[in-house]
Amino acid sequence: MKKLLILLLLPLAGCAASGPERYVDPLVGTEVWQGGIAIAGHEEASGYTFPAVTEPFGMTAWTPHTQASKEPGTLHHRVPYWYSHEYITGFIGTHYPSGAVMFDYGAVELMPVSGTLRVRPEERSSSFRHQTERPTPARYEVTLADYGIDVRRAASKSAAAFEFTYPECDSAFVVVDAMPSLFTAGAPASITVSPERREISGKSAQTARAYRETGYFVVRFDRDFADYGTFNQNMDYPEVIENRYLFTEQEGKMVNGLRGVYTHRSPWQGDIRSERIDPVIDFDWDWYRPADDIDVKDYQVTWSGQLLAPESGEYLLGLQADDGARLWLDGELLIDDWGPHGYSMTPVQRAVTLEAGRMYDLRVEYYQQEWSSRVKLSWVRHEEGARRLLLRGNDRLESSTKCGAYVRFETEAGEPLRAWVGTSFISEEQARANLEREIGRNGVDRVAGATSELWNELLSTIELPGADEVQKSVFYTALYHAFLLPRSLSEDGRYRSPFDGEIHPGESFTDYSLWDTFRALHPLLTLLRPELSSRLVTGLLNAYDEGGWMPKWPNPGYTNCMMGTHGDAVIADAYVKGVRGFDTQKAAEAMLKNANVKGNHIAWGRLGIEDYNRLGYVPVDHYRESVARTMEFAYDDWCLARYFEALGDTLRSREYDERSLRYRNVLDPETRLVRARRSDGEWSSPSDYDISVWSGFNEQGVLNYRKNYTLFAPHDIPGVVDFLGGDRAAEAFLDDLFDNGIYYVGDEFSMHAPYIYNFCGMPWKTQRRVYDIVNTYYLPSPSGLPGNDDCGQLSAWYLFSAMGFYPMCPGSPEYQLGVPCLPEVVLHLPNGRDFRIVCENFGPGRCYVRQVTLNGRRLTRPVIRHEDLLAGGELRFTVGDTPATDCYEARL
């Protein structure tokens, strides 16, 4: 009711945003960054953001859903909005985690069309011009050029208000798609049209790698329906080609199935192979071996045999794969999807005419390169879809995998049609309650005004006196991205847990990109919103209660994404910085389980923990990415040490301090780089591709990753400097990283690298590197993010670095000092105090610090503590355009 009261008191707002919200450009990060990448050529340097309209940490974000063309099969991009796409298929209420290469779930989409009714995404889509877009955090406007329809939209936490202004016509339609996401196809859905209530309601679900999470929705209109119906695209969603239609020769006779030949692709692994008859091609090996003699990474499968068509007619043959796949029929290459990419629930399809009773030679090739491995061969009778698509006058569809509804209205020119949408993960009734509570029947302007107030309140936490328009745009856009996630799942004081499927009282969050966000995003929230930080920790502990483990990367439930258990770091960092209000004993229990108990699934705990505790490292012949696991487990152990130290548990603190040095067991003194070890203690080949699934599987990529991962011991940087050969050798190592394009700010494991110069006695080099990255890599344009934003982490790195300090080692109350890239910054802290950062003599190229004072006292080391910030006061940097080797008297 509080939100609704705010709405009623607000004056009608115009389109222009006010306050710091007016500097936010939600299109930043929606296009590929133009700077290129050296560390791994196939990584896509895109922000993977989208123009999200929602409240801070909102449950449902609304964005245009775009595609590259109107051709079938082109709606394949993981992120819902891509700046270079030319068509909008609808306006989606999404739960895709901004900036991350992960999954959407429980989405719903609205699309206004006029003239001929079109419901398929590629057919209903409309071209648009970016000049007609008006995006802000609270609202979005655009003109659909093909229909002449103006769209205005605003949103709250879990609801949205729309206005569609059509040309004068008697065929103004709104299409409601219950399964619009690439990652929801194939899951059960339903939709109901209720003319008497002027509503369409339903549910959609998700079957990607996370726990299935059903999304419920209610769409309400401001007038009666002139006509309505449902549509069903089940028949366009393919089925696995059954065993009875597949044949191969075995011992001189034909048997059902296809012959699969499994081989390694990497030259260093040799031509190890396995052969078998597979009944169908429908595999989800995830991170496991596809065959006994085949490793879990970098392999290829070739299936061969014959295909029998049961009936004559046109079929759509389809392939879905993670990573690449291609298909030949009678020697002709029909599908060529040969490239590294994630698994899409929408297959790559090609039409082919088949004759009943005829056998066709079939060959399918598949390769796995990175992350999980999945592949599916499917087909569907193409002409059946057209016959059964539209069900006019039908008011309900249940248990459909691809369904939706449409309504028709009669409109006058210039008269807006209004619609409101409520969403929920609990029930349809809760979606309706969320709609009533948050926005009622208020229009776009009032809803946008209320959401703008929330954004301005949060963005105003940091003030930028003296900054120019470009600096404010980059900064406040980064702050907007930092305040989108984690996603609140709480609805009226309760939530449905994605970890056990039950409804619980209290509060929950999801889409914590913990491998990324423990580094800067969570420390930023701990500084600016410690009460929220406490709630986020409680959310992790609720997940522990409900599923038995703290998640590593919930989306919305457990996933096997990344290596360490960095919820440990989030909890330790929050606690040592004074955050309270969560169950400290439960946190200790959950962290100890991570550090000592082997999970019975790769999504739980630390994969390889039993070997890590037995050998002191994770062996390469047992687990992928063994070096990264060893390095990350050691850092997480250090975080446990700091947590138990703060609790007063000296014995445990000492134990985990000792464990935290195990990262040294994978430091190779011969190459002075990290290096994988086998379970017998011997070193693996220096060119072992195991270092990272993102290494590009070539020697240069492997070397680049080894160099970057060598630096990941943020808790023991003096030890890393010693390993590299001392100050001068470490300086040369870092110079090589930066000068030769080996360092990449868009990947997290070495984000702290610019600050390592501080530990070599060369803080002026930290200042120069940070200044260059901040001012070169972050821009106010769609291509203005140099990598995946990863739920705000890339933005948080910028925010700290632009302000002049950085949490190099979460779990420690210390921040490393760089150089401010803004003339002045004022932090309005939650305790009522202000902390001011002043850059004296600020100007272009003046990136070298002469001296730093804290409340008038000169600092002798490039460090400031968390309690110094909370006390309020002034941090003053005096800068110039030449290095000052005496800017600090003492070294770290």
State where each predicted segment sits:
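Short acidic, glycine-rich loop/turn motifs
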Residues: 144-146, 249, 265-267, 379-382, ...
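Sec-dependent N-terminal signal peptides
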Residues: 4-13
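Positively charged n-region of N-terminal signal peptides that target proteins for export
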Residues: 1-4, 717
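Extracellular/secretory pathway-exposed regions associated with glycan biology
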Residues: 241-316, 320-395
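Accessory carbohydrate-recognition regions in carbohydrate-active enzymes
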Residues: 17-245, 250-253, 396-569, 575-631, ...
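Short beta-strand/loop motifs in extracellular/secreted proteins, especially
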Residues: 140, 172-174, 313-315, 323-325, ...
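Short strand-turn-strand beta-turns centered on an Asx-Gly dipeptide
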Residues: 328-331, 830, 854-857
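ATP-dependent phospho-/nucleotidyl transfer catalytic cores
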Residues: 636
